[in-house]
Amino acid sequence: MGAPPGYRPSAWVHLLHQLPRADFQLRPVPSGFAPRDQEYQQALLLVAALAGLGLGLSLIFIAVYLIRFCCCRPPEPPGAKSPPPGGGCVTWSCIAALLVGCAGIGIGFYGNSETSDGVSQLSSALQHANHTLSTIDDLVLETVERLGEAVRTELTTLEEVLSERVELVAATRGARRQAEAAAQHLQGLAFWQGVSLSPVQVAEDVTFVEEYRWLAYVLLLLLVLLVCLFTLLGLAKQSKWLVVVMTAMSLLVLVLSWGSMGLEAATAVGLSDFCSNPDTYVLNLTQEETGISSDILNYYFLCNQAVSNPFQQRLTLSQRALASIHSQLQGLEREASPQFPAAQKPLLSLEETLNVTERSFHQLVALLHCRSLHKDYGSALRGLCEDALEGLLFLMLFSLLSAGALATTLCSLPRAWALFPPSDDYDDTDDDDPFNPQESKRFVQWQSSI
C-alpha cells in the first residue's frame, strides 16, 4: 500500500516491530497490529510484565544488600566515636545516583512534551479532516437545495410565460430534467452524510485522555524531582528523620517508575506494530465503523494512480448536466427575451443560480480529491508514529534511569544514615564526607581570620 506523503516508518518502528512476541504460554505471536485478538493482548501484557520482573529483581537485590549490610557489618570497637572510613564514598555514590535521576527527569520532561506534541498533531489532523468532510456535505446540500428551488420557482415560472411557444417550453422542460439529474448526481457525493463516526469526536476523546496522561507524568516527574532534592538536602544536613522519610518515598517512586516503564513499553511495542503498516488496520476499522464502500476508503487512504476516483462518473455527469443547462438557458435568452419580456427576470435568476452552482461544483471537485484528506491522514500518522513514539522512548529512558538511580539510593541511604554522627557530637564526623558541617565551620573561621 502507498505510504502517506511525508510518512515513512522510522528505524525505531522497524526495530520494535521485529522484537519477538509471545502469549502467556510462551507461544510465538504474529507482530501484526490486532488489539482485539486475545493472543496479541497477552503479548502486550507480557511486555508490560517484564517491568514487573525488573521491579521484583530490584527489590530482591535491595533486600539482599541491606540484609548483608545489617548482618555482616563488623562490630564497632568499644568506645569508638569516629565513624568507620569510607563514609565519603558512600555519600558520593548516593549523590551520583541522585544526579543521574535528575538527568533522567530532564529526559522525562522532554519525552512528555514530545508525546503531547504528537498527540496534538493527531488531534489537529482529525479536526481538519472533519472540517473537510463537513464542508463537502454542506456544499452538496446547498447545491441540491439551490437546484431544487430553481426547478420549483424559476423554471416553473418560465414554462408558464413561454406556454405559447411549444419549442421553448420543450427547451425549458429539458433544462428542468437536466437540473433534476444534476441534483441527483450531486447528492451521491456526500459520502460521509449520516455516518455515526465523527473525526472531531475522536479528536476530543484523544485530547481528553492525553490531558490526563500528560498531567500524570508531570506529577510523577515532580515527585521524583522532590525525592531527589530532599534526599540531597537530608544528606547535606545529615538529618536522620529526613533520610528515613526519603528512603520510604524512594521505595514508592521506585515502584511507580517500574510501573510506568511497563505501560510505556507495552504502548511503544503496540504503536510500532500499528505504524509499520497502518493502512490496512485503519481502512478495515473505518469500513467497519462507517459502512462506507472500500473503493472510497481506498481512494482516500492510498491516493495513488492505481486507485481511480470513485466519484469521477458522478462528477462528469453533473458537469455535463450543468453545461447542458447553461447551453439551453443561452438559447432561451436569445429566442425568448425579444418576444417575452416577462421571461427576462426568471432567466437572469436562473443564470445567477447556475453560476453559483458551478462555483460550488468546482469547489466540490477540489474537496473531493484525495489530496486534502490524504494529507491529513499523513499528518496524523507522523504525529502518532514519529513524535509520540519518540516521546514514549524518552519516557522509557527516564523510567529506567530513575529506577536505577532510586535502587542505588535505597542501597546507599541506610549506610549513609548509619554514618551520621549523633546530634551532640558533630566533631567526630568523617573528614572525607563532602557534607561534613565541621569542615564548613572551619572554612568559615579560616576566612574570618585572614
Curated annotation (Swiss-Prot):
Chain intervals for the UniProt region annotation (Disordered): 428-450
Keywords of the record: Cell adhesion, Cell membrane, Chloride, Chloride channel, Disulfide bond, Glycoprotein, Ion channel, Ion transport, Membrane, Phosphoprotein, Transmembrane, Transmembrane helix, Transport
Residues listed as glycosylation sites in the UniProt record: 130, 284, 355
Site (Essential for the formation of the channel-pore): 165
Disulfide bonds: 275-385, 303-370
PANTHER family per UniProt: PROTEIN TWEETY HOMOLOG 1, TWEETY-RELATED
Protein family: Belongs to the tweety family.
Entry function: Calcium-independent, swelling-dependent volume-regulated anion channel (VRAC-swell) which plays a pivotal role in the process of regulatory volume decrease (RVD) in the brain through the efflux of anions like chloride and organic osmolytes like glutamate.
Name this protein carries in UniProt: Protein tweety homolog 1
